């Protein structure tokens, strides 16, 4: 069945009178998108219910929690571990600033793990209170479709109950994938990596995406020997190639061993740990093997076919520009739709859904100039187009401005690690198409750049802006020398 793409005037605005249904809206999944969609819909007067699995730090078919992947087993606990890992470098840098650190500095993994768990338990409660204060009915259990207006919730005790709703919103997120190789059961995913009882001394990571790079930085900062394997020449496929090179250099500079163009072929248990065999015949012994090879939409147990909801070849729910599925009253937001899989994007999609369905304001999510960050050490952050993307879209030449410098702090600490910044500009309009930064505080700085790009800032706007001195951020408004001018007809290497 082909999806009908809605026009603005065709978007039905819900009448929140309940009608013959139990609820105006039933939401499956209380992650970032589900919670936002629930409470904003309730603020428009809708009668809303939401179902979610019982809380647990590690997800499964029967375990979840309010806040979803980001809060419980993703962005938040990961960032806490990044903070914890960063102190090793700070202690090293402190010496040349006059700090005399005598004796051993011991790291207590169990204490950090305990405090991390306490924080996500707290946040799980915060999300429940937000829903309760918004008037949303919370139901514990796993939801699945019976038909276009009925959801069946399987409770933790195995009992089942059905609820009807005029509209259904699916916001079940995604789950980590495992590579199908012999011994795969010996590996862990990011879920387990955030809750390990013991900190590994020897870690092998398979994958070149942001999760792989972040855990490589985390474990190395905590003292582990880390080997990172990935299929391409550089990690972070999809990011700007020049910035990918910078990240790879920084990882190696921090002591992480990179294995580009290499895959794992087999894992086996030995007396000394896990034996890892690569497709090049190399063998390594590790305490932990992490599969960081991507995530897949959480749609398998929703019984979507019962209502006629279409999915693509990886199980992502197909939606139109308003997040409506192939069934007119069923909607989906967040990772389960596999659009831009970021928490703030799920929040945006859910807000647009509520405005469209219950607010009388048909609103499409705007995916232009969405910023993102990789919390490696140091971090990478970007907004807008990479140089390669700009060349694919440009009708005129692309102007590239770059700055590579030693931050003031490194001048004293003697750390050999440069900060790199980049602006991509349309030569015809002078509009800044993209901004990238790899270095300390990059995500904090790029968030401000995102506002500038969203407002249509030109290079002249940047040049006329007064900087804050001394700061790294001022480099973005002092890059006046053109690094290179690139024609769209050129063919940059894109399969790195």
UniProtKB/Swiss-Prot annotation:
Q: What is this protein called?
A: Glutathione reductase, cytosolic
Lineage, broadest ranks = Eukaryota, Viridiplantae, Streptophyta, Embryophyta, Tracheophyta
Its primary localisation, in coarse terms, equals cytoplasm
Reaction(s) catalysed by this chain, per the record, are: 2 glutathione + NADP(+) = glutathione disulfide + NADPH + H(+)
| GO function terms (MF aspect) | flavin adenine dinucleotide binding; glutathione-disulfide reductase (NADPH) activity; NADP binding; thioredoxin-disulfide reductase (NADPH) activity
Q: Name one GO cellular component term.
A: cytoplasm
User: Per the annotation, how and in what number is the cofactor bound?
Assistant: Binds 1 FAD per subunit.
- Give a yes or no for keyword Cell cycle in this entry: no
* Record note on quaternary structure: Homodimer.
Q: Where does NADP(+) bind?
A: 208, 211, 214, 231, 237, 294, 373
Q: What Pfam family is a match, any one?
A: Pyr_redox_dim
Its EC top class is oxidoreductase
Q: Which SUPFAM superfamilies match?
A: FAD/NAD(P)-binding domain, FAD/NAD-linked reductases, dimerisation (C-terminal) domain
Q: Where is the active site?
A: 469 (proton acceptor)
- Record carries keyword Cytoplasm: yes
């Amino acid at each position: 069945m082909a999806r009908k793409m809605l026009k603005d005037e065709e978007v039905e605005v819900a009448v929140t009178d309940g009608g013959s249904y139990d609820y105006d809206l039933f939401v499956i999944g209380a992650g970032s998108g589900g919670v936002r969609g629930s409470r904003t819909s309730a603020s428009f007067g809708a009668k809303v219910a939401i179902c979610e699995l019982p809380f647990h730090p590690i997800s499964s078919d029967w375990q979840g929690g309010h806040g979803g992947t980001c809060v419980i087993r993703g962005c938040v606990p990961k960032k806490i571990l990044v903070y914890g890992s960063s102190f090793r470098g700070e202690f090293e840098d402190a010496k040349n600033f006059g700090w005399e650190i005598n004796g051993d500095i011991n790291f207590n993994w169990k204490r950090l793990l305990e405090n991390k768990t306490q924080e996500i338990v707290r946040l799980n409660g915060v999300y429940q209170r937000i829903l309760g204060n918004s008037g949303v009915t919370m139901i514990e259990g796993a939801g699945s479709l019976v038909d276009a207006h009925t959801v069946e919730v399987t409770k933790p005790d195995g009992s089942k109950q059905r609820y009807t709703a005029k509209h259904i919103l699916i916001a079940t997120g995604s789950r980590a994938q495992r590579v199908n190789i012999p011994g795969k059961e010996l590996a862990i995913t990011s879920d387990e990596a955030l809750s390990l009882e013991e900190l590994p001394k020897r870690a092998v990571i398979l994958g070149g995406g942001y999760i792989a790079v972040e855990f490589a930085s985390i474990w190395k900062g905590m003292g582990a020997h880390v080997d990172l394997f990935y299929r391409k020449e550089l990690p972070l496929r999809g990011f700007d190639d020049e910035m990918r090179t910078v990240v790879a250099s920084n990882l190696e500079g921090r002591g992480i061993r990179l294995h580009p163009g290499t895959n794992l072929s087999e894992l086996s248990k030995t007396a000394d740990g896990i034996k890892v065999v690569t497709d090049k015949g190399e063998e390594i012994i590790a305490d932990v093997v992490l599969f960081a090879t991507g995530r897949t939409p959480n749609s398998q147990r929703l019984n979507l076919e019962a209502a006629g909801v279409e999915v693509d070849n990886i199980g992502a729910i197909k939606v139109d520009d308003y997040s409506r599925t192939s069934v007119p009253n069923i909607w989906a937001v967040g990772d389960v739709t596999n659009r831009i899989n970021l928490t703030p994007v799920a929040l945006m999609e859910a807000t647009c859904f509520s405005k469209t369905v219950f607010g009388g304001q048909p609103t499409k999510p705007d995916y232009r100039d969405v910023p993102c960050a990789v919390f490696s050490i140091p971090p990478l952050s970007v907004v807008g187009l990479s140089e390669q993307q700009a060349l694919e879209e440009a009708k005129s030449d692309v102007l590239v401005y770059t700055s590579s410098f030693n931050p003031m702090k490194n001048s004293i600490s003697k750390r050999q690690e440069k900060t790199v910044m980049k602006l991509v500009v349309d030569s015809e309009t002078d509009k800044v198409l993209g901004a990238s930064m790899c270095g300390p505080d990059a995500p904090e700085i790029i968030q401000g750049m995102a506002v500038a790009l969203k407002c249509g800032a030109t290079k002249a706007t940047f040049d006329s802006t007064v900087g804050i001195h001394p700061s790294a951020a001022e480099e973005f408004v002092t890059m006046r020398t053109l690094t290179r001018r690139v024609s769209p007809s050129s063919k940059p290497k894109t399969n790195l």
